[in-house]
Amino acid sequence: MNQELNIALLQIAPTDTLQDNLQKGIDACRKAKEMNADIALFPEMWSNGYRMDGRETEEWQKEAIPADHAFVNAFGELAKELDMAIGITFLEAYDPQPRNTIVLFDRHGNRKYTYAKVHTCDFSVEKHLTPGEDFYVCSLDTRLGEVQVGSMICYDREFPESARILMLKGAELILTPNACPMEINRLSQLRGRAYENMVAIATCNYPDSVPDCNGGSSVFDGIVYLPELENSRDTCILQADGSEGIFVAKLDLAKLRWYREHEVHGNAFRRPSKYGILLEENKREPFIRKEYRP
């Protein structure tokens, strides 16, 4: 049986209104389904196109919507109609300040998790957001059976702990909405997170027509070695160019699962008893930042 999971990265540019983003998002999901996608993933904060920079805080915060808003629920209904999981992103209304959120709907329209970005960019406009509290992994029903899926968002990628926690919670696939330039160092981070955790990481960015973005959406399958290959392999199975479009990667679940059962990374040889310093909250120079929020 074919064990390839089709992951569609919706590298599309936002419009100026919630309603137009809803319609454009629906259209993109329908096109992804026509391309045989099992999962469709949006870029970061699709509801308002991550349009916060250069605007008054009160102005963009008014664009926040509840997690049960009609905009969000529409993608749950669409997921059921299309028999395709959808990861929809939005600026979530929350107290005391909005959150940067993804909701994953399964192909039956069920809400599997609501994840808010833990590592908000407190050195910039995201200091006016409420950070998320935890990382979540769900068992996602697909045409290939159950797949363990979690999420991190953009800057979360820059902290090894994000992907590590998701791996420890059982994630096989990490969905990562993004809104920033995907240059060699950020791509290297994703490659490294997939490698060290033996997980697949799918990242969806905005195209280069969006300010401070350049496309480059990617999927790393995390499989460095295969028995039929003499040497290591490139784990990148998809990297988009800068153009607007829908890009589909085929993730071989059978190979990923074999690899996770036999190789040496992930949780195979960790020694948590030696890692106590990782739980310390005291900061020392040169890492003291006045913007930091515990």
Question: Regions from the language model: what does each represent?
Answer:
Residues 2-8:
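Extreme N-terminal starter segment of soluble prokaryotic enzymes
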Residues 6, 87, 101, 216-218:
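Conserved beta-strand and immediately adjacent loop positions that scaffold enzyme active sites
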Residues 11-18:
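Short polar catalytic/cofactor-binding loops
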Residues 18, 27-108, 112-114, 180-197:
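Cys-nucleophile CN-hydrolase/nitrilase-fold catalytic domain and related Cys-dependent amidase chemistry
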Residues 21-29, 159-164:
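Short, acidic/polar
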Residues 64-67, 93-172, 177-178, 182-192, ...:
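Active-site catalytic loop in hydrolytic enzyme cores
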Residues 67-85, 157-247:
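CN hydrolase (nitrilase-like) catalytic-core segments centered on the catalytic cysteine
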Residues 207-294:
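C-terminal beta-strand edge segments of enzyme domains
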